[in-house]
């Protein structure tokens, strides 16, 4: 059945899903028999599209998790207050699972998530069904499954092996810092960065992330000078503006540690192509595939929470021998594109028991304690505690206004518009559909 017909027959769909969701499913529809999909297949594809928009890289198909996700996030509509509430007639998990089976007419790849030696290929039809013990477990787009596999593989390899540059250990670099004050977690972060192909430094604002990075660079400089060698380093962030802020902050912190930027660069060569991730990789509108190989000793990426999974995977894929140091606040807003890459890496490493990767900085050096207390309650999802902190400090923390609701709506509109523009650029929809938004 044509998607337009299905929308007419299911008016609730027009409230639950956004135009961009229908645009994505319309692309799949053209691959179906006679250019159409069954109702349950279209429903499954729409739920996948919305889950991507909400920063989930896949749609879980296990009954309990699928039901929970639909109830809390996917089967929701905007209410009178400007927020979201549960819509009526939540589809049964069995209906969605049946729709996934019917999507097989599109020829999606089927892989066993327990078969770690079977890589995901970028070549083939758009969809991919991941199974567990022969049972469908996730529905995803192939390109995101491919990106997730690259990230996961690097995490596992980094946790299970050390990689020393000319025998330089983390302890050696930490010892060179001498009397420079460092927290125990900060020293651990430097050790991980020096000895692992991938490490993560995370913490909220004012937790000392920049101090740790500056200390790492100073420690590398002192080690290189003592050994008579040089290290090559690239600094980058998701946007050019973030990259400028990163470099300025690091320079300031290096200076506070008693070093000059010029002396540091005698032994730690900072790539002059440092800047945005796109600039470092050589990504341009006319070049998205022939990317630059990153052969630096270290690549330090700030504000990683802003990176989507595909871009993060590109960094990893093009830096096979580099020590990657990812820095960011996992509790910040995730990328406007697909995936909460930093949060997923941290949670994934913790769930899998992968050690030697993540360093969490928890000491607050910047904010008033009441703001820190309020933010902590929000991050834990404890609404009662957050309200109690607000009531004790009305001069510091204020309630949201209608203007804040307007900001949220504009952000959602901008995200929808961006996805529509991408679809139009790929020829998956017409410019008139973009203008209609």
Q: What is each model feature region?
A:
Residues 2-168:
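N-terminal accessory nucleic-acid engagement/regulatory domains that precede
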Residues 185, 195-201, 231:
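Pre-Walker A (Motif I) flank of P-loop NTPase domains
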Residues 212, 216:
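Hydrophobic positions on the alpha1 helix immediately C-terminal to the Walker A/P-loop
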Residues 233-295:
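Inter-Walker segment of RecA-like/P-loop motor cores
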Residues 302-303, 328:
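Walker B catalytic acidic pair
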């Amino acid at each position: 059945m044509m998607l337009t017909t299905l929308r007419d027959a299911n008016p609730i769909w027009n409230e639950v899903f956004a135009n961009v969701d229908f645009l994505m499913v319309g692309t799949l529809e053209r691959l179906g028999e006679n250019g159409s999909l069954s109702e349950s297949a279209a429903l499954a594809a729409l739920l996948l599209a919305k889950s991507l928009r909400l920063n989930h890289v896949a749609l879980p198909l296990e009954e309990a998790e699928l039901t929970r996700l639909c109830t809390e996030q996917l089967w929701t509509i905007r209410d009178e207050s400007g927020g979201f509430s549960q819509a009526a007639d939540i589809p049964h998990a069995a209906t969605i699972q049946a729709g996934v089976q019917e999507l097989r007419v599109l020829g999606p790849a089927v892989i066993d998530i327990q078969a770690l030696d079977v890589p995901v290929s970028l070549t083939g039809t758009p969809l991919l069904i991941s199974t567990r013990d022969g049972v469908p477990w996730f529905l995803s787009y192939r390109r995101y499954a491919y990106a997730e596999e690259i990230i996961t593989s690097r995490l596992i390899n980094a946790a299970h092996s050390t990689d020393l540059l000319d025998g330089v250990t983390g302890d050696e670099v930490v010892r060179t810092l001498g009397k420079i004050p460092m927290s125990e977690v900060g020293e651990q972060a430097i050790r991980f960065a020096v000895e692992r192909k991938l490490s993560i430094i995370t913490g909220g604002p004012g937790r000392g992330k920049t101090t740790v990075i500056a200390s790492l660079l100073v420690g590398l400089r002192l080690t290189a000078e003592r050994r008579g060698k040089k290290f090559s380093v690239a600094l980058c962030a998701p946007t050019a503006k973030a990259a400028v802020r990163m470099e300025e902050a690091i320079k300031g912190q290096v200076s506070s540690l008693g070093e000059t930027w010029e002396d540091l660069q005698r032994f730690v060569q900072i790539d002059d192509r440092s800047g945005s991730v796109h600039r470092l990789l050589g990504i341009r509108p006319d070049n998205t595939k022939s990317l630059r190989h990153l052969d630096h000793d270290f690549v330090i990426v700030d504000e990683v929470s802003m990176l989507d999974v595909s871009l993060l995977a590109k960094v990893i894929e093009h830096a096979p021998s580099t020590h990657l140091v990812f820095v960011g606040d996992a509790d910040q807003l995730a990328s406007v594109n697909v995936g909460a890459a930093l949060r997923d890496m941290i949670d994934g490493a913790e769930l899998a028991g992968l050690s030697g990767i993540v360093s969490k900085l928890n000491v607050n050096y910047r904010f008033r304690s009441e703001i820190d207390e309020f933010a902590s309650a929000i991050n834990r999802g404890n609404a009662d505690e957050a309200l109690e902190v607000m009531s004790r400090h009305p001069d510091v923390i204020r309630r949201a206004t209608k203007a804040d609701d307007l900001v949220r709506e504009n952000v959602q509109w901008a995200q929808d518009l961006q996805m529509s523009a991408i679809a139009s650029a790929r020829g998956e929809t017409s410019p008139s559909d973009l203008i209609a938004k």
